[in-house]
Amino acid sequence: MSEEAPKHEAPSVISPIENEEKGLAPKPLERVPPNGGAKAWACVAGSFLLQFCSFGYVNACGIFQLYYQETMLKDQTSSALAWITTLQIFLLFMFGPAVGKMIDVYGCRRTLPPFSIGAVFSVCMLSLCTKYWQVMLAQGVAFGLAAAGLSLPAMATATQWFSTKKGLAVGIVSAGSSLGGVIYPCMLPRLIEQVGFASAVRWTALMQGILLFIANLLCSSPYPPLGRASKEASAEKDATEPTPRRSGLRGFKSLPWGFFVLGCFFTMWGLFAPLNYLPEMAALHGYQSFARYTLAIANAGSLVGRIVPGWVSDIIGQFNTMCIVTSLSGVLVLAFWLPLEFHTSLAGIIVFALLFGFVSGGFVSLGPPCVVSLAEDRVDEIGVKLGGFCLAIALGALTGLPIEGAIKDREGNKFTGLMCFAGATMILGGVCTGTARVFKGGPRLMKKV
């Protein structure tokens, strides 16, 4: 009587179909980031270039404002010229989250090329512009939309590769916009002097085309795009297994969230005033040849400000750090920039540009972590709240600079009213952010929030 040898069975793998037959809920596809590797850091480098060519170009707004004011569009008011910059920033933040969702669904390989082509095309069209409405369409609308498809999605693409190194990756990527704010203000005025505005802008378009081509080659995602199939599968699952959902709008009713969004809105009312008007102020006070470098100095400070406040926030908390940088931004304008209107010095302009660049860089880098903290890591609320945050930023940017330009137009070549408005609104933004911090973490000052 022969005995059968014991069989060593391999562990069974239950397919989603078998799960469904047995009444088990199908497990979602696990997406574990590689957290490093050659492709991951190549994607970080590519995203750095995307930021350099998009938000970095927008950071050179003061140079364009100065050139338009003095040469090409002398018949336009400061308020009218400010709409060019504000429209870029508004479109960048308004449509950035939507493009980020497109990258999730279709992948960066399909999404980034059209926006890269659009960015280069809009800069080429700017070189042909001679009238205000043409500049508004080419630089304000066309480049603003293209930048929306490159800047915020650059962050999303790079962070997909990391789990524990996301902070470092975001810091490197966001530094691309600050470096752009250093390079463009130094490069463009020199080119304009040598070859004229049209040729200078075309050379810029050529440089951006080369860099964006490299960026598109380097950027990739560790996961396959979700596509429409996952949407249909999710809808089918919801139909067969209905589960109660919490509305994403529920989070908007919380007091911490309301005050935080209000604080971001007021801060954006004043944040771009020094970046847009500091070169013009330096030129009017006798530093014409140095005016072009004020933006480069401010963005050099911002380069450090993107990283250091993030490191500090790991120690004392994101909200505590956010309250400090927003309030300091307003205090610097009122206590440092405003006196320079009456007692102008080259050293004072340099120090103010560095300090303000540092604290304003902290506001830009700390916003998204505060949003995640307010959502309490609930995935169903992070996207909605990030969209609300971007909407507040966009509306603040859209209305802030034109208001400040209108104030300046009433005062002629003086910046006193503009400075008071910008400083007061940023301090008000700091107060609102501080109120949100108290509602979220309590009144104890030393608590990490």
UniProtKB/Swiss-Prot annotation:
SUPFAM superfamilies noted in UniProt: MFS general substrate transporter
Disruption phenotype: Leads to complete abolishment of hexadehydro-astechrome production.
Transmembrane regions: 44-64, 80-100, 112-132, 135-155, 168-188, 195-215, 255-275, 296-316, 322-342, 346-366, 387-407, 415-435
Upper lineage: Eukaryota, Fungi, Dikarya, Ascomycota, Pezizomycotina
Protein location: Membrane
Job description of the protein: MFS-type transporter; part of the gene cluster that mediates the biosynthesis of hexadehydro-astechrome (HAS), a tryptophan-derived iron(III)-complex that acts as a virulence factor in infected mice. Required for the production of HAS.
Name of the featured protein: MFS-type transporter hasB
Pfam families documented for this protein: MFS_1
This protein's record includes keyword Kinase: no
UniProt keyword annotations, A-Z: Membrane, Transmembrane, Transmembrane helix, Virulence
Up-regulation conditions: The expression of the hexadehydro-astechrome cluster is induced by glucose. Expression is controlled by ambiant iron conditions in a hapX- and steA-dependent manner.
UniProt organism field: Aspergillus fumigatus (strain CBS 144.89 / FGSC A1163 / CEA10)
UniProt keyword annotation of Transmembrane helix present: yes
Family to which this protein belongs: Belongs to the major facilitator superfamily. Monocarboxylate porter (TC 2.A.1.13) family.
GO molecular function: transmembrane transporter activity
Mode of membrane association: Multi-pass membrane protein
Main location: membrane
Leader sequence segment: none
Listed GO CC annotations: membrane
